Amino acid sequence: MAEAGVGSAEGAEEERRAVEENFPVDGNSCIASGVPSLMNPITKPATTSFNNSVVEIPRKRKGSDSDNQDTVEVDGDPQKRNEDEEHLKIKDFREAHSQTEKRRRDKMNNLIEELSAMIPQCNPMARKLDKLTVLRMAVQHLKSLKGSTSSYTEVRYKPSFLKDDELRQLILRAADGFLFVVGCNRGKILFVSESVCKILNYDQTSLIGQSLFDYLHPKDVAKVKEQLSSSDVSPREKLVDGKTGLQVHTDFQAGPARLNSGARRSFFCRIKCSRTTVKEEKECLPNPKKKDHRKYCTIHCTGYMKNWPPSEVGVEEENDVEKNSSNFNCLVAIGRLHPYIVPQKSGEIKVKATEFVTRFAMDGKFVYVDQRATAILGYLPQELLGTSCYEYCHQDDHNHLAEKHKEVLQNKEKVFTNSYKFRAKDGSFITLKSQWFSFMNPWTKELEYIVSNNTVVLGHNESAEEQVSYGSQPAEGAVKQSLVSVPGMSSGTVLGAGSIGTEIANEILELQRLHSSPPGELSPSHLLRKSPSPALTVNCSNVPNKELIQLCPSEAEVLETSEQNQGAIPFPSNEPLLGGNSQLDFAICENDDTAMTALMNYLEADGGLGDPAELSDIQWAL
């Protein structure tokens, strides 16, 4: 039995050695790390006892159990090893990810610290700012620079066919101002364009080399200095610390070295004017006692900052000031005169003037009516087309409008009328002011139409009684006459007033014919009359200098009819409306039938309705 026990002990010892050789126990072993509890019964007696017999006795007693455990452990080893390997891979991946995140955080912190050192607003801070505050300050600093590269390079683009002087003249003409260059250190005027004479009435040579601060209003000097010296003139945002929640106060002032080329500038200032300009301002300003307004003009300056080498600008004498910066900083801007706005009276509401546009032919007949006229006058555009504007104007305004009508036909400039009354559709009168100018066809060199920009001065504010009283008061020098009351017409208008414009147009055409060279070269407008032919020559007293006017046959027939009836020679069918004794006196008629007959005879003579030759030209519908 003793030998058998010894033999079994030796067999167990050999099996243990074989297991140790196949699966060494060390720090990197999978079994040692994965199943330490299974190895403890084998390794623990060896480490705690130095006697071989003591080690062999417990193994002898538990020989069968340990054999079974070792057999099971060896049989399930591949699956266990796979789980251990996966566990190690996950552990290694987590360790590598944590190391990567740590390196990224360290790198970001270093970049934030470098950014904080580069931002001027962060330097005066005694404590360390959080990351969010540093980023906000960086954004604010970048906004203050206002794009020094891209916006500045855009200024250099110009068409290749334009020279620098031509481009400068075009810019000054479009801006309606003067160009000037001012140094940022002392405010010295380095350049000013010749157009400054038109605005400030100063000579160009008298301003170059002078200090801009000497011409500024005392209260505007500090503002202009701020624009010339500070690189951050825009209102800053309120910065709040993310950790403490308190507002961060920054006391930072930009030095000359921080002025950035291309930074935009726009400000208003008051500049001293010359004496001749002061005299003009005394008349337009409501309070001439204020000396500041009389001496200074408000100028709107817009431009950008520019860096130049001192040698290019010619400021060698200022090199002592430019020690801290390699380039010379200056402001390039355009100054435009800001118009003076008269203060509005208290209680008044400033409303945009009501306007509408119309077009007339040479004889004053509407050829185009703006749609806005419907809301003002009540007429539809098609109701006014083809009718004369004199038919709707008050009779007391005919003389004034006729003078302006002649003026706009003879001149190419704009003509402004005084206030006149225009009859609306409901019978009331609206006060208008008009601006007339003639449009010439660029191909035929003939007048196409007259454009009229009409502005409402007073709305529908006159009743019928006021209109009658207004019409009953004639102009100065006019003879009081009895007016005809025709049903459907306002009391202020005159029957047959539409021929006034035709008379004026014919008069202007005849004057042009007389003052022109050979008659064959004359090309009168075909809108009013046919080509002239020798017919009848009359002496018209209303034509300047008693010129002789050549009339067409249709006009001659009207004159012959008027000679037989009245024994006088008036202007053909139109003159009675302008002269002082030209009103149709229907009061001599005994009854309404006689007045109506006379009215129809006049309309036939005026419109040519009784001429059978003209009826043949009408295209009758079949």
UniProtKB/Swiss-Prot annotation:
What is the annotated role of this protein in its UniProt record?
Transcriptional activator which forms a core component of the circadian clock. The circadian clock, an internal time-keeping system, regulates various physiological processes through the generation of approximately 24 hour circadian rhythms in gene expression, which are translated into rhythms in metabolism and behavior. It is derived from the Latin roots 'circa' (about) and 'diem' (day) and acts as an important regulator of a wide array of physiological functions including metabolism, sleep, body temperature, blood pressure, endocrine, immune, cardiovascular, and renal function.
Under the heading Pfam families, the entry gives:
HLH, PAS, PAS_11
Q: Enumerate the subcellular locations listed in this protein's record, separating them with semicolons.
A: Nucleus
**Site entry (Interaction with E-box DNA), positions:** H97, E101, R105
> What is known about its subunit structure?
Component of the circadian core oscillator, which includes the CRY proteins, CLOCK, or NPAS2, BMAL1 or BMAL2, CSNK1D and/or CSNK1E, TIMELESS and the PER proteins. Interacts directly with CLOCK to form the BMAL2-CLOCK transactivator. Can form heterodimers or homodimers which interact directly with CLOCK to form the transcription activator.
Indicate the segments forming the PAC domain, all copies.
417-460
CDD domains given for it? bHLH-PAS_ARNTL2_PASD9, PAS
- Give expression by tissue: Expressed in the pineal gland.
- Which InterPro entries does this one have? bHLH_dom, Circadian_TF, HLH_DNA-bd_sf, Nuc_translocat, PAS, PAS-like_dom_sf, PAS_fold
| Domain (bHLH) ranges | 92-145
UniProt keyword annotation of Repeat present: yes
> Which species does the entry assign this protein to?
Gallus gallus (Chicken)
State the protein's name: Basic helix-loop-helix ARNT-like protein 2
Keywords for this entry? Answer: Activator, Biological rhythms, DNA-binding, Nucleus, Repeat, Transcription, Transcription regulation
